Amino acid sequence: RSSVHFYDPNTFTLTPENSDGKSEWGHTAAAGKFQAGSNEEHVVSTFSKLYEKYIMNNIPVYIGEYGCVMHNNDRSNLFRNYYLEYVCRAAYMYCMPVMLWDNNVKGGGNEHHGYFNHTDGTYVNNSETLVQTMIKAATSTDANYTLDTVYNKAPK
């Protein structure tokens, strides 16, 4: 079995507040606000390579850590939600379970990966709907719920 971490592109998922940080992701992102070469096609390409090299050779792969920090504005968080749903659905389509990284840090900014309160299990950062969306994306067997349906819901 093999485990990988997935935080591509880190300028969007981990360090959006840095000088080279990015506030948007995917095919609808505005020019200059996304990391070139690290959009939906990159996710599919990366997961496809893992699938072909390992899973097709009976070596299980799971994404042992992934996530995207809470950003500091609503528009950026729309792209965050889209990214997380897309990555989870792509992982499902390529037969890889996912494990969300949660460091219990509330609020927005670099390394703010809080989804649950580690003391009482409640949701933080208004993450309940997002977490339910990620669970659906990572587990749904609905044949009509595809990467294309997620792609077509990207923020405008």
Can you annotate each of these PLM segments?
Residues 73-156:
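Aromatic-rich peripheral "rim/lid" segments of glycoside hydrolase catalytic domains that contact
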